[in-house]
Curated annotation (Swiss-Prot):
It comes from Neurospora crassa (strain ATCC 24698 / 74-OR23-1A / CBS 708.71 / DSM 1257 / FGSC 987). This is Chitin synthase 1. Residues 1-570, 651-664, 738-744, 865-884 are extracellular. It catalyses: [(1->4)-N-acetyl-beta-D-glucosaminyl](n) + UDP-N-acetyl-alpha-D-glucosamine = [(1->4)-N-acetyl-beta-D-glucosaminyl](n+1) + UDP + H(+). The chain crosses the membrane at residues 571-591, 630-650, 665-685, 717-737, 745-765, 844-864, 885-905. The keyword DNA repair does not apply. The gene is chs-1.
Length: 917
């Protein structure tokens, strides 16, 4: 039966709107007591100062909750505004749309002893609250107990009443007061003591959406590691508003058929370990009803719990600025019910294992059509999740898709003042404008970022997921040599970019013709590293993982022939193969290419040349014939010295331990690059100082090409470089209707682009051995209560469970909400040192081969001592040819990207006219 609360007339907490403003001290009666409390608290009267306006950010909405029964009258179960206290009471009227500013939810967190202790010893406080007989006011309390039968004698699955405030927040039209549906009145907890592969109906495990016979069309997964409550709230609230966009569709031929749209959507949160979880985040989840303290069990009858699974359907949400939102009316801004599954893993077993819980455990029971993957901190824009789903709905062969990820720039773009943020913003933008559309045109997007991507569930079932989960450390014993422990260092690095492996396996799936696509209308916003150490550490994993995964896809390209793709698609896959091989080669030799480009430009501009029959006279620029060559030589030595320094730092230091040295390196390379840009501008001006018609021989096409690109002609080479490298960036950005990054981020990128090779790639390759795998146990889990099994009256397995009265549940909820809505204070505790000392021999061989091949290329190009090997050209001639080849090859790759972008843009514009709605 549905839960109806107590039978003595206790109605619990009533959610109600209170006008926004500040506290008036004691100028209110008992019926209008602050927040949830009947009794005076030390932080009530003086938490903000009498008649002092709050300092918390003010939302456009208002929601508070009164513990005093009858505080405000109710109508059909929905609380309405009480009469304001005298003199304006709580302040000026807030808009009654369902959000609370948050400042009425607690005290002065900087001075309150209770909250100061909580901030210092947060984890210990959380552990004390997990004891079943913990009283809301502290200490222990004796409670009545109930005996609960285990499912199939081994599975612990219990229903717990939610706080009255959460129950009363549900709109009446969704309540099933007389039926058996308890999803709004009780939270369901399951202690999973099995591997994700064994989380099956056969073994006694189940999930509410399937129990209610609901079809799951969309499974939205949020993976979490150690993000703070602001980052999680940003993602979670954006997801709920996106679900509201879907529910509000009026003319949908799908979502409005066969039941309410919200019943076809499930949000799954997977947290990677108790130790790493920010306990303030759990308070946020408890505030919306998805989690409760004092519920989890570390083991069931001695069998260790692997994952704690909570289920609840909520209409509440917490915004990133700690404002609580609840439904007020049936307007379009009201959040619909959202079905939540919260999986809190007991141990930190990495992201791949979190995805195994998602796909192999929950996915097989719910059998969704589309799974959307988000990282905590990613903020999907309005209607973005709908746009991702529509891509699958309109293309039956679409196996995976991703949207546009862009950097979070702060209010007014203030973060763009940080060069690292601006560089990453430009990188994201160009990837979204040129790279992703090109790969989408081919049908194989090399990486669908795990922070914002989607897959068709039946497309990834089978071999794609099997190969993907080979990187899960918890399967190492089961898989043997195929598992992570049996892999060489190359394969381990490959799984640092595991999403690339899944993409390739999906497209190459035998007998199938799944393809991948980029969906422009879906946009997500994410934080990017703002400091040099964080930036370098992130790119170490990205560069090593993507390089290994790229080689994997090239070496296993033959498996494409076993797929079901048609001949046209296969032709474009071969074109993409050649394009990817070229990119890998250019990436490998990029260290030498940047050095040669730098020295060639310095020599072309700074070396004085006397007039002769083959060349015109020019002087060293910008400091004259004597100073310029000397200045350039000094810069070359500085350049080489800092490159060598990067090897020393990468082999012996962590970025966080050499922060200022790395910052200095970024600064020095940017100064050298700025000097090269000035010299390049001078080269362009000098090349076009003679009118173009005088440089060209237009007698015939052959002579015209020879005068433009051959011999001593430099105008043609420079013209090609300007158009293909820089011109296409501007043209594509304007065609994409998003050109602003070319003005505020492109200049930073021009200054720092050499650091991508000279700092980031050097650090990445020198730390090839650093793969952070393995399972880390949970120290906190040892202090959690156990579920002891005994025999019941009919000899069945039962567990004795504490049964708290509703008053205690509600009183505990008071403190939870205060903690959840407290102002966020950033944790500045330094991270512990984490070093991996294995596989250094492989790293050494990799670095030696990479460094030797790049040095060999540089020496061959710039040295005159190779005549004995049959190389008759002088070093200056070889340098000129290499420089031309480099510019032409780079230009050709840019043209290919631009063609792919044009095809994608045209196809997207045409197909949107025929897409089903």
């Amino acid at each position: 039966m549905a839960y109806h609360g107590r039978g003595d007339g206790y109605d619990g907490h009533q959610l109600q709107d209170l006008p926004g403003g500040h506290n008036q001290g004691d100028q209110h009666d008992d019926a209008q007591a602050p927040f949830l409390s009947e009794n005076p608290m030390p932080y009530d009267n003086d938490r903000l100062g009498t008649d002092t306006p709050p300092v918390r950010p003010v939302s456009a909405y208002s929601l508070t909750e009164s513990y005093a029964p009858g505080a405000g009258t109710t109508r059909a179960g929905v609380a309405v505004n009480p009469t304001p206290p005298p003199h304006g009471g709580y302040g000026g009227g807030g808009v009654s749309s369902g959000v609370d500013q948050g400042y009425n939810y607690g005290g002065d967190y900087a001075t309150d002893p209770a909250y100061r202790m909580s901030a210092i010893d947060e984890d210990d406080s959380w552990l004390r609250r997990q004891q079943p007989n913990a009283a809301p006011t502290g200490g222990l309390k004796r409670y009545a107990t109930r005996k609960v039968k285990l499912v199939q004698g081994s599975v612990l699955s219990l229903d717990y009443p939610v706080p009255s405030a959460i129950r009363n927040a549900v709109q009446p039209k969704y309540r099933d007061e007389e039926g058996n549906n308890e999803e709004f009145f009780k939270m369901r907890y399951t202690a999973a003591t099995c591997d994700p592969n064994d989380f099956t109906l056969k073994n006694g495990y189940d999930l509410r959406p399937r129990m209610y016979n609901r079809h799951t069309e969309l499974l939205i997964a949020i993976t979490y590691y150690n993000e703070d409550k602001v980052l999680l709230s940003r993602t979670l609230h954006s997801v709920m508003t996106n679900i509201r966009d879907i529910v509000n569709l009026k003319k949908s031929s799908f979502w409005n058929r066969g039941g309410p749209a919200w019943q076809k959507i499930v949000v799954c949160l997977v947290f990677d370990g108790l130790d790493k979880t920010d306990k303030n985040v759990l308070d946020v989840l408890a505030t919306i009803g998805v989690y409760q303290d004092g519920v989890i069990k570390k083991d069931v009858d001695g069998k260790e719990t692997v994952a704690h699974i909570f289920e609840y359907t909520s209409q509440l949400s917490v915004t990133p600025n700690q404002a609580l939102i609840r439904p007020v009316d049936d307007g379009p801004q009201t959040l619909p019910p959202v079905q939540f599954i919260f999986c809190l893993k007991q141990k930190n077993t990495k992201k791949i294992n979190s995805h195994r819980w998602l796909f192999n455990a929950f996915g097989r029971i719910l059998n969704p059509e589309v799974c959307i993957l988000l990282d905590a901190g990613t903020k999907p824009s309005p209607r973005s999740l709908l746009a991702l789903w529509e891509g699958f709905y309109n293309d039956k062969d679409l196996g995976g898709a991703c949207g546009e990820i862009h950097a979070m720039l702060g209010k007014g773009g203030k973060k763009l003042l940080n060069p690292l943020v601006a560089v990453q913003n430009f990188e994201y933008k160009i990837s979204n404008i040129l790279d992703k559309p090109l790969e989408s045109a081919f049908g194989y997007v090399s990486v669908l970022p795990g922070a914002f991507s989607a897959y068709r569930f039946r497309a990834i079932m089978g071999r794609p997921l099997e190969q993907y989960f080979h990187g899960d450390h918890t399967l190492s014993k089961l898989l043997g040599k195929k598992g992570i422990e049996g892999m060489n260092i190359f394969k381990k690095n490959m799984f640092l970019a595991e999403d690339r492996i899944l993409c390739f396996e999906l497209v190459a799936k035998a007998g199938q013709k799944w393809h991948l696509s980029y969906i422009k209308a879906a946009k997500g916003e994410t934080d990017v590293p703002e400091g040099a150490p964080e930036f370098i550490s992130q790119r170490r994993r990205w560069l090593n993982g993507s390089f290994a995964a790229s080689l994997y896809s090239l070496m296993h390209f033959g498996r494409m022939y076993k797929s079901g793709h048609n001949i046209v698609r296969m032709f474009f896959f071969h074109v993409q193969l050649i394009y990817n091989i070229a990119n890998v080669i250019f990436t490998w030799f990029s260290l030498a290419s940047y050095w040669l480009t730098t020295t060639v430009i310095m020599d072309l501009v700074g070396t004085p040349v006397t007039a002769s029959s083959s060349s015109a006279e020019h002087h060293g620029w910008p400091f004259g014939d004597t100073v310029t060559p000397f200045f350039n030589a000094v810069l070359k030595y500085i350049y080489l010295a800092f490159v060598i320094l990067q090897f020393i730092l990468a082999l012996g230091n962590r970025p966080k331990g050499s922060k200022w040295t790395y910052i200095t390196s970024f600064f020095v390379f940017s100064l050298i690059q700025s000097y090269i840009l000035v010299l390049s501008g001078y080269l362009v001006a000098r090349a076009f100082s003679v009118p173009l018609d005088q440089q060209l021989q237009l007698d015939n096409a052959k002579d015209a090409m020879a005068s433009l690109f051959g011999g001593s002609g430099s105008a043609g080479v420079i013209l090609v470089a300007l158009v293909t490298i820089y011109g296409l960036y501007f043209l594509a950005s304007f065609m994409y209707l998003d050109p602003w990054h070319m003005f505020h981020s492109f200049p930073y990128y021009m200054l720092l682009m050499s650091t991508y090779i000279n700092i980031l790639m050097i650090y990445a390759f020198n730390n090839w051995h650093d793969v952070s795998w393995g399972t880390k146990g949970s120290d906190k889990a040892e202090a959690l209560p156990s579920a002891n099994v005994s025999k019941g009256e009919k000899d069945e397995a039962v567990v004795e469970e504490i049964e708290k009265p509703q008053e205690d549940i509600d009183q505990q909820f008071e403190a939870t909400v205060r903690r959840a809505l407290a102002p966020y204070k950033e944790d500045e505790t330094p991270e512990p040192k984490d070093l991996e000392d294995s596989y250094k021999s492989f790293r050494t061989m990799l670095v030696v081969s990479w460094l030797f091949s790049n040095c060999l290329l540089a020496v061959v190009i710039t040295s005159d001592n190779f005549n004995t090997f049959g190389i008759g050209q002088t070093a200056s001639a070889r340098t000129a040819w290499f420089f031309k080849f480099l510019l032409f090859a780079t230009g050709a790759l840019s043209v290919i990207r631009f063609i792919g972008f044009c095809w994608f843009l045209g196809r997207t514009g045409i197909m949107c006219c025929f897409a089903r709605r």
